[in-house]
């Protein structure tokens, strides 16, 4: 009897340890000694991290009206004014794509520093306030358009909070989803057959779609729900796991939508991206602070293209 009880206790202790272990390293996605590090503070409200091919991080400070640069040591101004940019991503040619709140448009920064407007209206009406974007291998740019950043005194002109795609060849803007409350972060699976879109409005969940020809979405379903806070920025790693911002930090889900674990962060991250010299650092923009943690994985899109998928 005593032996049976001892065995039972041992089993309970071992399984509790295993659970603790799997939560701390996220089933091997993080090194065992990985720790959240604060890289910079004193910012206003930061969003949209993107790792530039030149080897530094950019991110938006929305109220400060600047895109910032973190060079591994210091934070400086990368572009100002930014028209209160929010989400940033990198295209296949290494160019920075930015979603502007007060500009109510999506822009691309060319190699000479000039900006090209990629989208600012749909059916003759102003966009709401583009929030986040992702670029497909063929160059099609997908972005979300909730109304969070419409400047005071201006009106919402669109009848929906759309998810849009800018066709790589024709440059035409297509509404690909109109039934989101507040569509926000988005990312592709490694094979680009699935698109994940966060809804940071009432549903507080992430939906997944099959990507069909002619940039249309099919078979939409709920992928996962966020239990604390809302899903804002999301990223996919090379194995198809989804890393989502949430109220208490970052929540990581398997390709089947099962919660693998959480990374707790002192401030609530609004967005995240993979980057660093080897692509294995996860950067998190969290209110007034920029944070990072080392991982054992990379973004679905690889190292020098922003790791943004
Ligand atoms: Mg966002």
Give the positions of each predicted feature.
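Beta-propeller domains
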Residues: 56-77
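Short loop/turn segments immediately following beta-strands, especially the blade-tip
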Residues: 209-216, 295-301
């Amino acid at each position: 009897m005593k032996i049976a009880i001892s065995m039972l206790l041992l089993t309970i202790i071992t399984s509790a340890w295993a659970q603790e272990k799997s939560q701390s390293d996220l089933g091997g996605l993080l090194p065992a000694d990985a720790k959240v590090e604060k890289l910079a503070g004193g910012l206003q409200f930061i969003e949209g991290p993107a790792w530039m091919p030149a080897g530094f991080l950019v991110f938006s400070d929305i109220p400060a009206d600047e895109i910032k640069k973190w060079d591994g040591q210091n934070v400086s101004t990368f572009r100002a004014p930014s028209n209160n940019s929010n989400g940033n991503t990198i295209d296949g040619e290494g160019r920075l794509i930015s979603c502007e709140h007060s500009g109510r448009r999506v822009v691309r920064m060319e190699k000479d520093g000039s900006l090209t407007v990629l989208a600012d209206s749909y059916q003759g009406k102003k966009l709401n306030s583009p929030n986040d974007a992702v670029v497909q291998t063929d160059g099609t740019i997908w972005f979300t358009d909730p109304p969070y950043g419409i400047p005071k005194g201006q009106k919402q002109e669109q009848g929906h909070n759309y998810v849009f795609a800018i066709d790589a060849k024709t440059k035409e803007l297509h509404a690909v989803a109109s039934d989101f409350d507040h569509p926000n972060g988005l990312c592709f699976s490694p094979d680009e057959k699935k698109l994940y879109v966060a809804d940071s409005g009432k549903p507080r969940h992430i939906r997944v779609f099959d990507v069909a020809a002619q940039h249309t979405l099919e078979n939409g379903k709920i992928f996962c729900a966020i239990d604390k806070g809302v899903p804002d920025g999301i990223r996919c790693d090379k194995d198809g796991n989804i890393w989502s911002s949430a109220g208490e930090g970052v929540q990581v889900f398997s390709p089947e939508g099962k919660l693998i674990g959480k990374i707790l962060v002192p401030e609530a991250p609004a967005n995240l991206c993979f980057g660093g010299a080897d692509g294995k650092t996860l950067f998190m923009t969290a209110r007034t602070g920029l944070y990072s943690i080392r991982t054992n994985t990379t973004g679905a899109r690889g190292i020098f293209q922003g790791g943004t998928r």
